[in-house]
Regions:
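Two-component/phosphorelay signaling modules centered on CheY-like receiver
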Residues: 5, 13-32
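Short amphipathic alpha-helix used as the core "switch/output" element in two-component signaling
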Residues: 39-42, 64-76, 93
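Acidic catalytic/metal-coordinating carboxylates
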Residues: 35-36, 61-68, 86
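Active-site residues of response regulator receiver
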Residues: 55, 83
């Protein structure tokens, strides 16, 4: 991806949204913030391609439920789950629901950047695979019956 990598940051804590988006922008990412999962889901189907940083403990709808709804909508952007409650059970549920990584708050900048780098590599590999699949389908459609 040659364009700026976009991160959808979903966290109910304004201080976390502000500090994380500042740090991520300085690291070269583009960041769109959402105050909770409901607000994010309202725009998720039109959301630009990118990765999702998703807090687990939020009012109205927790991060795991947001993940389930994304899956139900067929939205498969890479999700990195953020939590200040780094218990193993939540991590396992998040990973089973399709999260690509799990980062405990407070996190080190390098840890978060490394998780995002892996998530974007996964997204780019999937995008490349989709392009190759589309090209193969096009070739098959152009074949003449024998």
């Amino acid at each position: 991806m040659s364009e700026t990598r976009l991160i959808h940051l979903v966290d109910d804590d304004e201080a976390v949204r502000h500090s994380a988006s500042f740090m991520l922008r300085h690291a070269g990412f583009s960041v769109k913030t959402y105050a909770d999962g409901v607000i994010f889901l309202e725009s998720a189907q039109q959301a630009a391609l990118g990765c999702i940083l998703l807090d687990v403990q939020m009012p109205h709808m927790d991060g795991l439920e947001v993940q389930q709804r994304l899956n139900a909508l067929g939205i498969s952007l890479p999700v990195i789950v953020l939590t200040g409650h780094g218990d193993v059970e939540v991590a396992v549920k998040a990973m089973k629901a399709g999260a690509v990584d799990f980062v405990e708050k407070p996190y080190e900048k390098q840890t978060l950047i490394a998780a995002l780098t892996r998530a974007f590599e996964r997204l780019e590999a999937r995008s490349h695979k989709d392009v190759l699949t589309d090209e193969a389908k096009g070739r098959i459609e152009r074949l003449t019956p024998r």
